[in-house]
Amino acid sequence: MDIYIHGYLICLLLFLFRSETACHPLGKRRCEMQAFRIWDVNQKIFYLRNNQLVAGYLQGPNTKLEEKIDVVPIEPHTMFLGIHGGKLCLACVKSGDEIKLKLEAVNITDLNQNREQDKRFAFIRFDNGPTTSFESAACPGWFLCTSLEADQPVGLTNMPTEALKVTKFYFQQD
């Protein structure tokens, strides 16, 4: 009888103190979207140019072009990433032998971690001191990156230590 009471207490505690960073397993509870600022370790910030996410140095009146990253946490370290109020989502897309980062017109709050077709939108966050890296959940080993050169597209790399790509970002809640 004691075991049943303990089981009920554990269930009650888990229900009362559920993680606020994870969505309901069935995807029925709407997740809270949060806005973050992101910039790489070379101080390049994200902005949209010709419907493509790029990283560069914005100064003066151009600082208004900065794109905030919209985040919907789905597990403690896994999240969906988007821009424009969560209406454009970052996706890891396989095309033949190539893996690319694309922006797709999808509402971030409609995504569901349990749907295989939504996995391309999920990224795993790795914090290392003050910096953060993002690995694609759909394409393990592929990381969000910027180029050393300014005003180049944000992309993905499977060589995160390559000198020509930057995979470490500062990621701060707005």
UniProtKB/Swiss-Prot annotation:
The keyword Phosphoprotein appears for this protein: no
Looking up Gene3D superfamilies in the UniProt record yields:
2.80.10.50
Q: Which residues are glycosylated?
A: 107
Q: What keywords are annotated for this sequence in UniProt?
A: Disulfide bond, Glycoprotein, Secreted, Signal
Q: Which GO terms describe its molecular function?
A: cytokine activity; interleukin-1 receptor antagonist activity; interleukin-1 receptor binding
Q: Name one GO biological process term.
A: negative regulation of interleukin-1-mediated signaling pathway
Q: Which SUPFAM superfamilies match?
A: Cytokine
Instruction: Note the Pfam families from the entry.
Output: IL1 (PF00340)
Q: Which InterPro entries match?
A: IL-1_CS, IL-1_fam, IL-1RA/IL-36, IL1/FGF
Name where it's found: Secreted
Leader sequence segment: 1-23
Subcellular location, principal: secreted
Name the cystine pairs.
Answer: 89-139
What are the GO cellular component annotations? extracellular space
Q: Which family does it belong to?
A: Belongs to the IL-1 family.
Q: What does this protein do?
A: Anti-inflammatory antagonist of interleukin-1 family of proinflammatory cytokines such as interleukin-1beta/IL1B and interleukin-1alpha/IL1A. Protects from immune dysregulation and uncontrolled systemic inflammation triggered by IL1 for a range of innate stimulatory agents such as pathogens.
Name of the protein described by the UniProt record: Interleukin-1 receptor antagonist protein
Q: Which organism is it from?
A: Bos taurus (Bovine)
Point out the gene that encodes the protein.
Answer: IL1RN
